[in-house]
Structures are given as C-alpha cells and as structure tokens.
Amino acid sequence: MKFFALFIHRPVATLLLTLAIALCGVLGFRLLPVSPLPQVDFPVISVSASLAGASPETMASAVATPLERALGRIAGVSEMTSTSSLGSTRVILVFNLDRDINGAARDVQAAINAAQNLLPSGMSSRPTYRKVNPSDAPVMILTLTSDTYSQGQLYDFASTQLSQKISQMEGVGDVSIGGSSLPAVRVALNPVALFNQGISLDEVRQAIAQANVRQPLGNVENSQKRWQIQTNDELKTADAYAPLIIHYSNGAAVRLSDVATVEDSVQNSRNAGMANSKPAILVMIRRAPDANIITTVDNIRAAMPELRASLPAEIQLDVAQDRSPTIRASLAEVEQSLIIAVALVILVVFLFLRSWRATAIPALAVPVSLIGTFAAMYLCGFSLNNLSLMALTIATGFVVDDAIVVLENISRHIEAGMKPLQASLQGVREVGFTVLSMSLSLVAVFLPLLLMDGLPGRLFREFAVTLSVAIMISLLISLTLTPMLCARLLRAVPKRSQPRTQGFNRVLLAMQQGYGRSLKWVLNHARWVLLLLLGTIALNVWLYISIPKTFFPEQDTGRMMGFIQADQSISFQAMTVKLQNFMTIVSSDPAVDNVNGFTGGSRTNSGSMFISLKPLSERDVSAQQVISRLRIKLAKEPGANLFLMPVQDIRIGGREANAGYQYTLLSDDLNELRTWEPKIRAAFSKLPELADVNSDQQDKGAEMALTYDRDAMAQLGISVSAANALLNNAFGQRQISTIYQPLNQYKVVMEVDDAYTQDVSSLDKMFVINSDNKPIPLSYFASWKPINAPLSVNHQGLSAASTISFNLPEGTDLSSATAAIERTMTSLGVPSSVRGQFSGTAQAFQQSQSSQLLLILAAIITVYIVLGILYESYVHPLTILSTLPSAGVGALLALEWFGAPFSLVALIGIMLLIGIVKKNAIMMVDFALVAQRSGKLSAQDAIFQACLLRFRPIMMTTLAALFGALPLVLTSGDGAELRQPLGITIVGGLLMSQVLTLYTTPVVYLFFDKLRTIRRKAPEKDLSLS
C-alpha cells in the first residue's frame, strides 16, 4: 500500500485524476442511449409466402414444408415454427442469441432460393423475409382517419407514402398496415347473365387480362427526330373496364358491364380497422432487432410534421400508441431513487462521523464513482435502462463502503491524537488490504454471471458490469482521493462541540456496549450459535423450494394487447360486429385511454386490439387488475373471446399467441394431435392456476367439400383444372390483372357478385363451358356437403404442432402454473406419440430454474477462491462466507412478506447479498488476524476486540447499503414492479444478516481456530509418544 501514499503527498495530481474520471463520466452520460432494458433481442426472421385461394392444408404441405426443410438446415436455429392459413404461410425462425442477424438473413435468403423449385408454380411472388419478430408489440401505432376519403384510399396513402418513409428511418424493422387493403378494380360477375350468354368465367378473366397489357412498343425515328410509340393499352379505372367487350353473341357485343358490376374498391373487401370506434387505418411500427426504442420513436415523432404534410388536408394522422412515455417515466423514477439513495447514504455518514468535513469526503467519493461509471458504460455499448440505473442505485451503498472504512479508520487515529497526515498514511496502510478484499470479493460474485450464456446472462450483463465498474472506481477513489482529503480536511473535534449528534452517539454507544455484553454470552455458548447457523442453512433450502417463482416480474407498461378468437365458422360481417362490441366494452373501463383494433385478412375468425392505459398517476389499478375486471364483462359476449395481456419488454419466442405463456403439443400424427388437443385444453381450462386458456388449433372451420364425378366429367368433356378454375374465379377474389401507377401497383380482382356468395345454393348457378362450348352446370358433375376443416395448420420443427396459450390469474405465480400443467399431463395418460413442452417465456423459465442454484453456487465458489488467494488460507474464507445463510433467509422471508415471487431480479439480489454481507465478516476477521498474529491477544480476545472496534464501520456500511436499496422498496411509480424485488431482497437480507452475522462470524472464527489448534497439537502428541 506504499504506492497509494504518493496520492496523499501529491494532492494536485490526485484531484486532477478525480476530475478526469468525472469529466469522462459526464461525457459518457450525454452519449448513452436510453432504453427500458438491456438489448436482449433474440435474432428473429419472419419468412412469408402467399398463394391466393389455397387452403390452409395446401399451404402447409405445398409451401410451408418445402420452406421448412430448407430453412431447418441453417446453423444456429433454436426454434422454427410455421402457421399456414387461407392463402398465406408464415415461417418464424428464432436464432441463438450469439447468432448475427445479418449473417442469418443471408442464410435465410439462400435457403429460400434453394427451395424455390419445390414451391407451387402458381405463386404470384417469391417468398420474402423480414428481420423482425411478428409477435413483438409495436413500438408505435399511427392511425389515419378521414370523413371524405374511403378506407381503401387511406390504406393507399399509408402504403404508398407513409410506410415507405417510415421504413427508411433508423431503428424501424417493420411497418404493417391494417384495416383495409390497397385500392383495386373489382369485377363482380353475375353467373346467371353469364349462363344466358354462354360465357364462362375464365373467358371473362382472359378478356380482362388481354385488355390491360403493358409491354415495350419501340420507337420511330428519322434523321432529325425520334418518337416513342405509346398506346392506350392500359386500363386504370372501373369506368374504363366497364365497357370492355368480352364476347360476341350472335354478332352482338357483350360488354363487361352487361354481365358484371365494375367498381373502384379494394383488393380484399374483408378487412376492417377502427380507432376508438371510428373507421381507421392502423400503421403498426415495430423496431428492428437491437434497435433502441427511444431513438426509433423519437425519429418517427420528429418526422411527423413531414408525414402530415405529405397527406391531403382531409386526412388526419394521429399517434394512437407510443411505447416511450412509460419508459421515460420509469427511468425518471429510477433516477429519482438514485438521488434519494445518495442523499440517504450521505446522511448516514454524517450521523456516524458527526462532522461536515468528514461527511464531505465520502459525499465527494460517491458521485465521482457513479459518474465515472457512465464512461465505462458508453465504452461497453450499454444504455441507460432500468437495470443499469438500478445497479447504480444499489452501488450507492457499496461505493461509499470503501470510503467509510478508510475514513473511519483515519478518523479513529486522529481522535486518538495523531496528526491528520500521519493518520492518513497509517490508516490507509492498515485497511488497504481490507478494502481491496471487500471490493474484489464483491466483484467476484458477478464473474459467473458474466460468463453465463443465454437470456439471463445477456440480460444482467449490463447490471453486473455497471456495478463492478462502480465498485472498482470506488476502490481507486477510496485509496487515493479519500486519504488525501482526510489529510487536509479532518481535524480533531471535541465531542462537546457536536450537540446535534450527541443523542445519536449515545444511542450508538449504548448499542455497542450492549453488543459487547451479548457477544460475551454468545462466545461462551458457541454450540447453540453453531446449531442456529445449521438451522439457518436448512431454512434456506426449505424457503427456496417453497417460495413462489416466476421468470421476470410482470411489467405494467401502460399498454395491453388483445386477441379476439371467434367461432371458427363466423363470417367477416359478424366478426366486425364482435370487434366493435369488444372495443366498446374495453373503452368503457375508466383506466383505458384509447383502443384500436382490426380484423380480416387471411384469418377470418380473429382480430387484434391495441389498448393504451392512462398514466399510473391517473389510475389506481395495475394493468393486470384492469384485465381481471374486464375479463368478467368480456365473458358475456357470445360466440367470441377476447384475450388480454400486458405488453412486456421481454417476449421470448416467435410464435404469435393469444396469451402470455404457451405449452406446445407436437406429434408426427396430425389426427392423433387433433384428438388429444381438445382433451388437454379442456383439462387445462379447469385448473385454477390458469386463465384465458386457448389454442391455435382450429380444425372446426366450416368447409364445403365438393366431390367430382370423374366419369361424368369425362363424358361431358370437362377437365378438373377447368372445374377448379371456375371455383377460383367465382369465389377466390382472384387477382387477374395489374394496374401500374407511378407510385404503386394495383390489382383487378374478379369474383361473383356478393349476392351469390352468401349461400351454398349459389353453387347451383355455377357452370363450366365444356369442350363443345356448351355451359354445363356444376351440379351435373359434382356434389357437395358441409364438413369441418382447419382454418390454420401449425408446425414446429417439422412436426405438426398445437400451442395452448394461457395467462396467469392475478396473484398466481408461474411456478405454480407450470407444476399444475405437468401434473395434469401426467394424470391424463397422453400417449408417447403426442409430446408436450413449454414454449416461449414458460420454457425460458423452466430452463432458468435449473441454472439458478448452479449460478449461486458458482458465485459462492468464486468468492471463496478469491478470498482464499487474498488470505492464503482455506479456512478464513469459510468464516467469511458463514454470513450468507442468514442473508438468504432474510431475503426469502422478505419476498414472502411482500408477496413477491422469486424472479431473475430477486436472484440478482441474492447474488448481491453474497457480496454485501461478507463485508462485515471481512472487517472482523481482518482485524482479528492482525491482532492475533501480533502475539498479543488470544483468538477469542482478538475476535472480540475486532467486533467492538469494527462495530461502528459495520453499522455504517450496512446502513449505507440498506438505505441505498430502500428507495427501490418504497418506489411506486412506473417500473416499480422491476425495482421492488431487488430492493426487497437486499433490505431483507441485510436486516437479517446484520443481526446474526455480528454473532455467528466470531463463533465460526473461534470454531475453525480450535480445529486448527487441534490439528497442530495432534502431530506434536504423536512426536512425544514416539
């Protein structure tokens, strides 16, 4: 420690070094980005493919399976799921956390290219991919409304102008639009008129397609000029298509308007969107993987004036939902907790040291240590988020510890009559090793966490590094700035001149004297204390096993997502009514600010809702409580269910689900899976530990199954392809031509008039032109009957899959829910051909359970190794670590008392306690060893004196750590659900360990000393006998 004497003798250099650390920290703070949590996004790529009119089973077998076989060969894929519905397939690839998203995207594109030859030839476009997780909630939702423009026109503005501009902004990963579709010319055919004219639907299709052609025509030129040839070969509006001649009957022209209604409409008329019960187009913006939410949102908000200016004045563009306000509010709450923690810690120091001069020294060390940490955070690529700021808040009680130990020891020498300079040199020499041991052993706690892979390791890496850097800067400050300031600021102050702290000092002295008397009794009854310590260890095990557990505290982000699941045979019109009814019910809740939703597209019986809650200051209930009371009202809506869940910043997995947790059933036998899934779902629905139980298996959709009489078809001269083309032309909203415009491309859509799609009897009016050009009714060669058929087909890996989703009732923990599910699966006797496994967050929870104890054990072993190296002893580290059981009991009991489940945040609190509570033992053992090795005191006298001498700094450091964590316990604003488990764990552990450690540590110290003495005497006895 002679090196640090240089800093005492060179105050200018020391102050400039401190200033440099602080300035670097200020610069780093200004450059740090802001986010709710560390970036822990799994690389996710979504592959989409479409085949108009294809059934879900066709999409699964002809499109999804070839894609899955090719994509499944990519390295680093942790999960591959697919969903095939009417005309569309989506394959979601979730990669390992260490997989580079850009490299994965290149592999995905190569796999799509390899599978291209295996895909159906009728696909209008190649499969595409996006580097975005479709199950993530949007970071921002914009709405377009107008009293003059139609939904299709609004959708066109959103797609053509807004989507393109927003997609180019930094941080934006995907822009999806809901509520309608692009404008189109729709041709609604009258099959009766066509039959009377002897015109087939395919003839109409060909006539329209041939009338709208775009191709190069060439040019004409002479020696002087050049002319580009241009024709009117393109038709762009319904008015242009209506007079089109499609057939001649007995020499008379039959125009399109004679057999159809032609109008300017939209590509898919079965779409609806609403914002607060008003028709609207929703623009849903999702961030790119690893993009910063605040930066992304700020970029969009900054562009809003430009976006509004690009739209007609009659169109209103509003921000319906924004993730950033609650993030900013949460971070402001943490920053406030940090300031309160610093103030409380400085107050503790003043009460103990009774001098503003002495208090100013740690009061300077604390902000320098914390501010300097920002520089390291910036260099490491971290952000200002809830966890990193929580680390700094907790660090407030740690960074002052080193300064307190040095300051208190120097103050003790000055009070004994030593000059300040000499006291500083002597004091830092005496406790330098103690401070080093305390800091290094605390940092050692986080080494296993830094080496841990997976989500927990990535999630808490910033927390561990931030806290470790703050502690190391604190160590440097305590050995340089603190003794230098002590040498120049501290003076021996008569106790009589401190009237304001005399009362506190008398209390502290009485406590110290009482502690001394009780310690003597404890040392004389050491056996009972050792039994108490063993009982504490056993109690730890029992509490850990019995305490409710969850993966990550459920956040109240002020946003909720809703998923509507209606009867599988519901029509689009009825589904739109359900959406309106549900939005009305949700909007009526006093805690709800606004509601937006849409339905339609490829999933006819489902819809999505996005709900914004009022700020926490304006509502007296949590998001989960809002869901609980809405659940009762929503259950009264017949024929449909609305499942609500709070939006979370951490969502694991890529499967889109109607609830927060999933259990997936897999089988290679689709029929057996469809047999067992309803039984398992029904059993899950009866469990009180689960709520909102639902499944993505939808195999009861209404389907009209046509059976061709092939003999009759051959006799009538009709091919299967001609019959299929009839059905596709009539009912498939078939896109038969393309309209090219400067900013976008639009379609011509053909189907029979809506009047002929409302009832099955319309099939009687359908006909095919045979090889003899005669109209043959469909009923001549086909029969039909209604059956059940799947609305979607799901795969996971290459197996058929059904995912049962569920939420947790208020007050239920995830460990109870998973245990109940496992018991139910065992009791049902599910065959081995049907496999069940947790997915998404529930799967991550189960995986974390198996690693938590290993992580705690690794932290303890790491601390033991570091202490063993520092003390050159196998025994003294055990004495120091004997403080841990009491801290564990206190932490777990505190969680039980507050009704908080044991989560990853609480686990970090336990690991922090491993580093905190051993500080007290280090201070005792260090002084006892010095006294004992000097030969002046016995082991019992040495540890007794050490306990009394270090009583004041032990109380100071413990209270500092306790008050540093106390604001996290008492917080109640945005993000409190994240901060409270950490504060509860630390405060509970500190309170319990403070009471017990003061007695168990000296007893364990003497126990090991006696063992060592016995071992030494045994060889001497053997030598005397020989």
UniProtKB/Swiss-Prot annotation:
Keywords: Cell inner membrane, Cell membrane, Membrane, Transmembrane, Transmembrane helix, Transport. One of its GO terms (cellular component) is plasma membrane. One of its GO terms (molecular function) is xenobiotic transmembrane transporter activity. The chain crosses the membrane at residues 12-34, 336-353, 360-382, 431-450, 463-485, 525-547, 853-875, 895-917, 948-970, 985-1007. Its main location: membrane. Coiled coil: none annotated. It is a multi-pass membrane protein. The keyword Transmembrane applies. It is found in: Cell inner membrane. It comes from the Bacteria. HAMAP family: MdtC (MF_01424). Part of a tripartite efflux system composed of MdtA, MdtB and MdtC. MdtC forms a heteromultimer with MdtB. Belongs to the resistance-nodulation-cell division (RND) (TC 2.A.6) family. MdtC subfamily. This is Multidrug resistance protein MdtC.
